[in-house]
Structure formats: structure tokens, C-alpha cells
Amino acid sequence: MIQYKDLQFKKVLVLGLAKSGVAASELLHELGAFVTVNDAKPFDANPEAQGLLAKGITVICGKHPEDLLDEGFELVVKNPGIPYFNPIVADAIRRDIPVITEVELAYLVSEAPFIGITGSNGKTTTTTIIHEMLAADNKAPLIAGNIGTVSCGVAREATPENTIVIELSSFQLMGVRTFKPKIAILTNLFDAHLDYHGTFQAYADAKFNITSNQTEEDYFIYNADQEVVREYAAKSNATKIPFTSKGRSEIGISADDTSIYWNGDKIFDRSIIVLRGQYNVENIFFL
């Protein structure tokens, strides 16, 4: 397992740019790694690559050379949008070169705890509300992921006093090796991104990577109304907190037509929830 302190003098390939690739490249460069960036966009039309070259980072643009990995890279950080069947990614895996995404890199270098939110629907709203509530309570949250600043950008400024609230896609979670949020949240699970993952099973496996490294000292909040989610949750080693909107439950978070409950005890009336719609009631469960 690579730790951030081990990245100095390591040869690292960043595959694909956009915001996440730029942030990962800059962070790795600051940590003393020997960084090479490879992006399909031609250099002349690639201001991100031009900016990285100006900082002393090696840039290869316009194509993905078949022999690229012959340079002896010890780690590949790929853009989440690049699939694992990409020839370079597949070749790296065959060579036993670790392949991670920017989220995993951010986790390796950050001193702050993470609250990770994923799901097919509702994750953006949930991430935003959690961030706003922590901010209102002066908890110094930082928002990252698919909304806000990319993960590596946030990790560079985070301290142990911060909490990183991060929205996570299945693309990002496929690259999990050590990522372990203090609190993991799964809002729901429906067919999505099958063009990328191939099957619902592969998509679900990626989503449940959010809890794969958690221990009983961590928390996994999940949608107990969905059988597939319950089956996966049973495999988690985290302290599990189920939620249901199908009536009062003695375990976890629940709701009926009038009230919200915690372990069977009423905590407030549904009528005080300003956001309308059943999906927003479920989003409130995570707070």
C-alpha cells in the first residue's frame, strides 16, 4: 500500500487531465513525485497541459502511446471518466501497477476525516445539506468531489480540524484501495452508467466500495428499503445505521406519514421539513 509520504521520488503517471487531473498532478509535484501527464488532447489546444509543463511537469499530449508504461511508473492516477478497459489502464493492472483515482490520492494526503456520500439519486442534495449544517455549527467543513472543489484541491488545504464532505460517483469509487470515510452514506441504488460498468452488478460493486475499508469505528448509513442495498450492507464491517421511509422502526432512522424516528423514538414532526417531496424527506435522514 502506497502512503503519501512514500510518493517523494516515485514515478507517477497521471492519465487524463480536466480539473481532477490537473489538481492531482500539482499535488503530486508538490509532494516530490516525478510526474508525467498523458492527455489525448493536442498540446497546442490544451491550456491545462501547457500550465503543468510551465511548472516543470512532464507532459505527453495528443495520444496515448502504447509503450507509455515502459517508462517504469510505480503508480497511475487516472481520470475517473477513463474506463478500466482503456488499454493503458488494463496494461497497468496486468503489470501490477496500482491504479487509483484522484479521490484515493486526496485521502492519502489529507489529515481531515471524510464524510462520503454516494447513490444513484439524491447525493448532491445530501452533500450540500450536510456541508451547510456543519458550517452553521462552525465545524469547518470543506465540500469536494462532483460539486465544489476537486478532491486534491481540498486535500491540500485541509487540516485535522476540518471535515471533508465529498460527493462520490461510481467512477471514482472504482479506484478505491484504502479510502475509508468516517461516515459513508448510500442514498439509493438504481440502474445507471451501465455503458461504463457493463452490468448493474459491476455498478453496485463500485458503489459499495464506499464502505469496503470501514471498520466498526466508522458509520455506514444506508437505504434499508432496497433489498440489494440491504444485502450489500450486511457485508460491511462498519457500524450500520439503516433508514426506512416505510413506517416507524426500532432500529436506525425511520419515518411514517407524520413523524421522523431514531431507534423508534420520535425526534420531530415531518411538517417542519421545508423541502417538499418524499425524496427530500429521505435526504433529511442522513443529517
Predicted regions and their residues:
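N-terminal leader/targeting and accessory segments in enzymes
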Residues: 1-101, 105, 272, 282, ...
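A structural connector/turn signal
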Residues: 2, 209, 274-276
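Cofactor-binding loop segments of dinucleotide-utilizing enzymes, especially the Rossmann-like FAD-
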Residues: 17, 39-40, 120, 146, ...
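Short, flexible coil/turn micro-motifs enriched in small/turn-prone residues
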Residues: 4, 11, 16, 114-117, ...
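Local beta-strand/beta-hairpin segments that build beta-sheet-rich folds
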Residues: 31, 182, 265-269
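Adenine nucleotide phosphate-binding catalytic loops in nucleotide-utilizing enzymes
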Residues: 10, 15-17, 55, 79, ...
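Short beta-strand "acidic-cap" motif of Rossmann-like dinucleotide-binding folds
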Residues: 35-39, 143, 165, 242
